Amino acid sequence: EAGIAVGIAPSRFISNEHLTEMVEHFRGRFVGMASIDSANSIRENLDIIRTYAVDGPLKGIHFEPGHSSLPLYADDPKFYPIYEYCQEQGLVVGIMLGGNNGPNLINHTNPAIITQLAADFPGINWFICHGGWPWVTEILGACFWHENIWIEPDLYMFNCPGAQEYINAANGFLQDRFMFGSGYPLLPLGETVKRAREMFSDAVYDKVMYKNAAELFNLT
């Protein structure tokens, strides 16, 4: 009904096993990302990545360390072996950086985190969920300097402070690394697709809505 053919699905509220089953059952409709947990040991997280992303059908990992039972920052040195492995395997790394992202809502969303990670791991394409909001100018600056950062602000590009900055970036320098996110179920699918059509120029609309994600996740 909303014209959405393919969706990105991190395993936020379901297990990696169930996400894998969903991706395989609805083949071609969902791009899955394996979730890891900062409360796990490094070995446990590496095993998850190997099982579900390297040897399985999931396209990368999704990480929300601020939401864990052991809240940490994504640039904690503890996680560097995980990132090293993802870089070796050519996996996309998605990090929740924005919105309600940990006990300290400002510090856990600080774009200084991804700026450091993008510099330390230039071989990783970093996928920033929630677009680094509310640090809009700062995250866009990080994207300007680091071409391995991709963002999708989802609901934060609709009627939130800084929304126009996202839209200007998508229609300009960031048009090849900016992706649409519906914000569903917080926002209705049909309405967000309709509003996105009004936000983006004809030259970049297809990129933002599909082509950029297809390139990032190597979809054929």
Tell me what each language-model feature is.
Residues 1-6, 173-179, 187-220:
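Mid-to-C-terminal alpha-helical segments outside catalytic/metal-binding sites
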Residues 2, 26-27, 56, 121, ...:
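A structural signal for short coil/turn segments at secondary-structure junctions
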Residues 5-6, 13-101, 105:
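Active-site gating/metal-coordination segments in enzymes
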Residues 12, 66, 131-132, 156, ...:
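Flexible loop residues that form catalytic
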Residues 17-21, 50, 115-116, 140, ...:
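Active-site phosphate/pyrophosphate- and oxyanion-stabilizing loops and adjacent acidic/basic residues
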Residues 19, 52, 61, 86, ...:
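Conserved, mostly hydrophobic/aromatic
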Residues 23-27, 53, 118, 143, ...:
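N-terminal cationic-hydrophobic initiation segments that often serve targeting/anchoring roles
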Residues 59-60, 73-179:
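Catalytic pocket-lining loop regions of alpha/beta-barrel enzymes
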